[in-house]
């Protein structure tokens, strides 16, 4: 998967199209990512010992990785991801600017 935790992405399809956020978690087996502030779902929580009031909580739900695009670190525009070997290590590069993408976990 070309998106990693800590990456800044833009949603390119779906109900939250146009929103930007940071990737909180990746789910590689399901090809999904959880993005901060995107795809907010309401979860009805029963009262428990930890949360005696219960109520309705809002949390981010996962969206398919094909619906997000990585933001170029140089221009802050959506870009595709390429790979290049630098000093024997495989690194991700932004296709638009050629800039190396560093994951900031």
From Swiss-Prot:
Function: One of two assembly initiator proteins, it binds directly to the 5'-end of the 23S rRNA, where it nucleates assembly of the 50S subunit.
Pfam families given in the database record: KOW, ribosomal_L24
HAMAP family per UniProt: Ribosomal_uL24_B
GO molecular function list: rRNA binding; structural constituent of ribosome
GO CC, alphabetical: cytosolic large ribosomal subunit
PANTHER family listed in its UniProt record: MITOCHONDRIAL RIBOSOMAL PROTEIN L24 (PTHR12903)
Protein family according to the UniProt entry: Belongs to the universal ribosomal protein uL24 family.
Entry's Gene Ontology BP terms: translation
Presence of the UniProt keyword Secreted in the record: no
InterPro entries given in the database record: KOW, Rib_uL2_dom2, Ribosomal_uL24, Ribosomal_uL24_CS, Ribosomal_uL24_KOW, Translation_prot_SH3-like_sf
Subunit structure: Part of the 50S ribosomal subunit.
SMART domains: KOW
Domain of life per record: Bacteria
Entry keyword annotation includes Transferase: no
UniProt protein name: Large ribosomal subunit protein uL24
Gene3D superfamilies given in the database record: 2.30.30.30
Keyword terms, alphabetized: Ribonucleoprotein, Ribosomal protein, RNA-binding, rRNA-binding
């Amino acid at each position: 998967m070309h998106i990693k935790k800590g990456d800044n992405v833009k949603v390119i399809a779906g109900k939250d199209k146009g929103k930007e956020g940071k990737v909180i978690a990746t789910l590689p087996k399901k090809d999904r990512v959880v993005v901060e502030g995107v795809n907010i779902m309401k979860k009805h929580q029963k009262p428990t010992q930890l949360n005696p009031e219960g109520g309705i909580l809002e949390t981010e739900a996962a969206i398919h990785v094909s619906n997000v695009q990585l933001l170029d670190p140089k221009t802050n525009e959506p870009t595709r991801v390429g790979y290049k070997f630098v000093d024997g290590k495989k690194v991700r590069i932004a296709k638009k600017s050629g800039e190396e993408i560093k994951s900031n976990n």
